[in-house]
Swiss-Prot record:
Source species taxonomy: Bacteria, Bacillati, Bacillota, Clostridia, Eubacteriales
Cell location: Cell membrane
Name of the protein: Adenosylcobinamide-GDP ribazoletransferase
PANTHER family for this protein: ADENOSYLCOBINAMIDE-GDP RIBAZOLETRANSFERASE
Cellular component, GO annotation: plasma membrane
Main location per the UniProt record: membrane
Length: 252
Protein backbone atom coordinates (compact mmCIF):
# COMPACT_ATOMS: atom_id res chain seq x y z
CA UNK A 1 0.00 0.00 0.00
CA UNK A 2 2.85 2.41 0.79
CA UNK A 3 4.10 2.15 -2.81
CA UNK A 4 0.66 3.15 -4.08
CA UNK A 5 0.74 6.16 -1.76
CA UNK A 6 4.24 7.03 -2.99
CA UNK A 7 3.07 6.80 -6.60
CA UNK A 8 0.15 9.11 -5.84
CA UNK A 9 2.60 11.45 -4.10
CA UNK A 10 4.66 11.66 -7.30
CA UNK A 11 1.54 12.47 -9.33
CA UNK A 12 0.56 15.11 -6.79
CA UNK A 13 4.07 16.58 -6.54
CA UNK A 14 5.19 16.50 -10.19
CA UNK A 15 2.00 17.03 -12.20
CA UNK A 16 -1.17 19.11 -12.20
CA UNK A 17 -3.31 15.97 -12.18
CA UNK A 18 -5.58 16.37 -9.12
CA UNK A 19 -4.95 13.91 -6.29
CA UNK A 20 -7.22 15.06 -3.47
CA UNK A 21 -5.68 13.08 -0.66
CA UNK A 22 -3.37 13.84 2.23
CA UNK A 23 -0.24 11.75 1.65
CA UNK A 24 2.90 11.06 3.71
CA UNK A 25 5.75 13.35 2.59
CA UNK A 26 8.81 12.05 4.40
CA UNK A 27 12.13 11.76 2.58
CA UNK A 28 11.70 7.99 2.55
CA UNK A 29 8.44 8.43 0.62
CA UNK A 30 10.20 10.51 -2.01
CA UNK A 31 12.96 7.89 -2.24
CA UNK A 32 10.51 5.11 -2.99
CA UNK A 33 8.43 7.39 -5.20
CA UNK A 34 11.46 8.24 -7.34
CA UNK A 35 11.37 4.73 -8.78
CA UNK A 36 7.90 5.52 -10.14
CA UNK A 37 8.97 8.49 -12.27
CA UNK A 38 8.89 6.57 -15.58
CA UNK A 39 5.26 5.71 -14.76
CA UNK A 40 4.57 9.44 -14.41
CA UNK A 41 6.13 9.80 -17.84
CA UNK A 42 3.91 7.00 -19.09
CA UNK A 43 0.80 8.81 -17.86
CA UNK A 44 1.90 12.08 -19.48
CA UNK A 45 2.84 10.30 -22.70
CA UNK A 46 -0.44 8.39 -22.91
CA UNK A 47 -2.49 11.56 -22.41
CA UNK A 48 -0.45 13.27 -25.12
CA UNK A 49 -0.97 10.26 -27.39
CA UNK A 50 -4.74 10.45 -26.88
CA UNK A 51 -4.58 14.13 -27.86
CA UNK A 52 -2.64 13.10 -30.98
CA UNK A 53 -5.13 10.34 -31.83
CA UNK A 54 -8.14 12.65 -31.59
CA UNK A 55 -6.69 15.76 -33.22
CA UNK A 56 -4.90 13.93 -36.03
CA UNK A 57 -8.34 12.99 -37.37
CA UNK A 58 -9.26 16.63 -37.93
CA UNK A 59 -6.00 18.62 -38.10
CA UNK A 60 -2.72 18.36 -40.02
CA UNK A 61 0.44 17.20 -38.25
CA UNK A 62 1.78 20.66 -37.45
CA UNK A 63 -1.40 21.80 -35.67
CA UNK A 64 -1.61 18.50 -33.78
CA UNK A 65 2.02 18.87 -32.68
CA UNK A 66 1.29 22.27 -31.13
CA UNK A 67 -1.49 20.86 -28.96
CA UNK A 68 0.61 17.85 -27.91
CA UNK A 69 3.30 20.22 -26.64
CA UNK A 70 0.73 22.45 -24.94
CA UNK A 71 -0.93 19.53 -23.14
CA UNK A 72 2.47 18.29 -21.94
CA UNK A 73 3.25 21.71 -20.47
CA UNK A 74 -0.14 21.99 -18.78
CA UNK A 75 0.12 18.50 -17.26
CA UNK A 76 3.38 19.35 -15.47
CA UNK A 77 2.61 23.02 -14.88
CA UNK A 78 5.65 24.14 -16.88
CA UNK A 79 7.89 22.71 -14.15
CA UNK A 80 10.61 21.41 -16.44
CA UNK A 81 10.50 24.39 -18.80
CA UNK A 82 11.05 26.64 -15.79
CA UNK A 83 14.15 24.65 -14.89
CA UNK A 84 15.48 24.84 -18.44
CA UNK A 85 15.08 28.61 -18.52
CA UNK A 86 16.72 29.08 -15.12
CA UNK A 87 19.68 26.90 -16.08
CA UNK A 88 20.37 28.77 -19.31
CA UNK A 89 20.10 32.12 -17.54
CA UNK A 90 22.45 31.04 -14.76
CA UNK A 91 24.98 29.05 -16.76
CA UNK A 92 25.34 31.24 -19.83
CA UNK A 93 24.49 34.81 -18.85
CA UNK A 94 27.16 35.01 -16.14
CA UNK A 95 30.72 33.75 -15.82
CA UNK A 96 31.57 33.62 -12.15
CA UNK A 97 31.38 31.68 -8.92
CA UNK A 98 28.85 29.04 -7.96
CA UNK A 99 26.93 31.22 -5.50
CA UNK A 100 26.29 33.96 -8.05
CA UNK A 101 25.13 31.47 -10.69
CA UNK A 102 22.71 29.85 -8.24
CA UNK A 103 21.45 33.29 -7.24
CA UNK A 104 20.70 34.08 -10.90
CA UNK A 105 18.94 30.73 -11.27
CA UNK A 106 16.66 31.58 -8.33
CA UNK A 107 15.76 34.99 -9.78
CA UNK A 108 12.09 35.00 -10.84
CA UNK A 109 12.84 37.35 -13.72
CA UNK A 110 13.25 35.77 -17.16
CA UNK A 111 16.49 36.61 -18.97
CA UNK A 112 17.48 36.53 -22.63
CA UNK A 113 19.09 33.10 -22.46
CA UNK A 114 16.01 31.62 -20.79
CA UNK A 115 13.78 32.96 -23.57
CA UNK A 116 16.12 31.63 -26.27
CA UNK A 117 16.31 28.21 -24.60
CA UNK A 118 12.52 27.91 -24.33
CA UNK A 119 12.00 29.02 -27.93
CA UNK A 120 14.57 26.47 -29.08
CA UNK A 121 12.95 23.76 -26.93
CA UNK A 122 9.50 24.38 -28.38
CA UNK A 123 10.75 24.67 -31.98
CA UNK A 124 12.69 21.40 -31.76
CA UNK A 125 9.72 19.57 -30.28
CA UNK A 126 7.30 21.11 -32.75
CA UNK A 127 9.43 20.20 -35.78
CA UNK A 128 10.24 16.72 -34.49
CA UNK A 129 6.66 15.89 -33.53
CA UNK A 130 5.36 17.07 -36.89
CA UNK A 131 7.80 14.75 -38.67
CA UNK A 132 7.09 11.86 -36.29
CA UNK A 133 3.33 12.19 -36.83
CA UNK A 134 3.69 12.41 -40.60
CA UNK A 135 5.80 9.25 -40.61
CA UNK A 136 3.48 7.16 -38.43
CA UNK A 137 5.75 6.78 -35.38
CA UNK A 138 3.23 8.07 -32.88
CA UNK A 139 4.45 5.74 -30.11
CA UNK A 140 7.45 8.06 -29.82
CA UNK A 141 5.04 10.46 -28.10
CA UNK A 142 4.64 7.93 -25.27
CA UNK A 143 8.26 6.79 -25.06
CA UNK A 144 9.85 10.25 -24.89
CA UNK A 145 8.55 11.33 -21.44
CA UNK A 146 9.18 7.85 -20.02
CA UNK A 147 12.81 7.97 -21.14
CA UNK A 148 13.42 11.46 -19.79
CA UNK A 149 12.05 10.58 -16.33
CA UNK A 150 14.27 7.52 -16.10
CA UNK A 151 17.35 9.68 -16.70
CA UNK A 152 16.23 11.85 -13.77
CA UNK A 153 16.36 8.84 -11.45
CA UNK A 154 19.86 8.20 -12.78
CA UNK A 155 20.78 11.77 -11.79
CA UNK A 156 19.26 11.25 -8.34
CA UNK A 157 21.60 8.30 -7.93
CA UNK A 158 24.91 9.64 -9.26
CA UNK A 159 24.52 13.40 -8.78
CA UNK A 160 25.30 15.43 -5.69
CA UNK A 161 23.47 18.39 -4.23
CA UNK A 162 24.76 21.80 -5.27
CA UNK A 163 22.69 23.50 -2.54
CA UNK A 164 22.02 22.72 1.10
CA UNK A 165 18.31 23.38 0.68
CA UNK A 166 15.94 23.04 -2.25
CA UNK A 167 13.16 20.95 -3.71
CA UNK A 168 15.65 18.84 -5.63
CA UNK A 169 17.19 17.68 -2.35
CA UNK A 170 14.13 15.51 -1.78
CA UNK A 171 15.46 13.29 -4.59
CA UNK A 172 19.15 14.02 -5.20
CA UNK A 173 21.40 11.66 -3.20
CA UNK A 174 18.24 10.06 -1.83
CA UNK A 175 17.92 6.97 -4.04
CA UNK A 176 19.78 3.68 -4.17
CA UNK A 177 20.63 1.35 -7.03
CA UNK A 178 17.41 -0.51 -6.19
CA UNK A 179 15.19 2.47 -7.08
CA UNK A 180 17.13 3.08 -10.28
CA UNK A 181 16.79 -0.56 -11.38
CA UNK A 182 13.04 -0.44 -10.74
CA UNK A 183 12.74 2.78 -12.74
CA UNK A 184 14.81 1.27 -15.56
CA UNK A 185 12.46 -1.72 -15.73
CA UNK A 186 9.46 0.63 -15.83
CA UNK A 187 11.17 2.38 -18.75
CA UNK A 188 12.51 -0.55 -20.77
CA UNK A 189 9.35 -2.68 -20.79
CA UNK A 190 7.02 -0.20 -22.56
CA UNK A 191 9.90 0.92 -24.80
CA UNK A 192 10.58 -2.56 -26.14
CA UNK A 193 6.88 -3.34 -26.45
CA UNK A 194 6.11 -0.15 -28.40
CA UNK A 195 9.18 0.51 -30.55
CA UNK A 196 11.20 -2.70 -30.42
CA UNK A 197 14.56 -3.68 -28.99
CA UNK A 198 16.83 -1.99 -31.56
CA UNK A 199 15.25 1.46 -31.37
CA UNK A 200 15.02 1.22 -27.58
CA UNK A 201 18.73 0.50 -27.17
CA UNK A 202 19.72 3.39 -29.45
CA UNK A 203 17.48 5.88 -27.64
CA UNK A 204 18.54 4.68 -24.18
CA UNK A 205 22.24 5.03 -25.04
CA UNK A 206 21.78 8.54 -26.46
CA UNK A 207 19.60 9.65 -23.52
CA UNK A 208 22.11 8.54 -20.90
CA UNK A 209 25.07 10.00 -22.78
CA UNK A 210 23.27 13.35 -22.93
CA UNK A 211 22.48 13.07 -19.21
CA UNK A 212 26.12 12.37 -18.31
CA UNK A 213 27.28 15.29 -20.46
CA UNK A 214 24.78 17.61 -18.79
CA UNK A 215 25.78 16.37 -15.33
CA UNK A 216 29.41 17.14 -16.17
CA UNK A 217 28.40 20.69 -17.17
CA UNK A 218 26.48 21.17 -13.91
CA UNK A 219 29.40 19.89 -11.85
CA UNK A 220 31.75 22.34 -13.55
CA UNK A 221 29.38 25.28 -13.18
CA UNK A 222 27.90 24.84 -9.70
CA UNK A 223 29.54 21.77 -8.22
CA UNK A 224 26.47 19.54 -8.41
CA UNK A 225 22.82 19.62 -9.40
CA UNK A 226 19.64 21.34 -8.23
CA UNK A 227 15.93 21.00 -8.95
CA UNK A 228 16.38 23.35 -11.91
CA UNK A 229 19.06 21.04 -13.30
CA UNK A 230 16.62 18.13 -13.11
CA UNK A 231 13.95 20.03 -15.02
CA UNK A 232 16.45 21.16 -17.63
CA UNK A 233 17.79 17.64 -18.08
CA UNK A 234 14.26 16.35 -18.61
CA UNK A 235 13.67 18.87 -21.41
CA UNK A 236 17.06 18.33 -23.03
CA UNK A 237 16.66 14.54 -23.04
CA UNK A 238 13.16 14.87 -24.51
CA UNK A 239 14.51 17.07 -27.30
CA UNK A 240 17.32 14.66 -28.14
CA UNK A 241 15.04 11.62 -27.89
CA UNK A 242 12.69 13.17 -30.43
CA UNK A 243 15.63 14.09 -32.67
CA UNK A 244 16.87 10.48 -32.54
CA UNK A 245 13.41 9.28 -33.59
CA UNK A 246 13.47 11.76 -36.47
CA UNK A 247 16.96 10.65 -37.53
CA UNK A 248 16.01 6.96 -37.43
CA UNK A 249 12.89 7.60 -39.48
CA UNK A 250 14.75 9.81 -41.95
CA UNK A 251 17.59 7.33 -42.45
CA UNK A 252 15.19 4.44 -42.97
Amino acid sequence: MKYIYNFLLMIQFLTRIPVKRSLPCEKEDFRRGAAMLPLIGLIVGCIQWVVFYILSKIFPANITAIFIILVGMVLIGGLHQDGLGDIFDGFFSFKGDKEKIIEIMKDSRVGTFAVLALIFDILIKYSALSFIIENNMSYAIIITPIMSRCTLVFLFLIGKNAKKNGTGNLFIENVSVKEFIISFIFMIVPSVLLIGYKYSVIIIVVSFIITLAFLNLCNRKIGGITGDCLGANNEIVEMFTMLVFVALLYIN
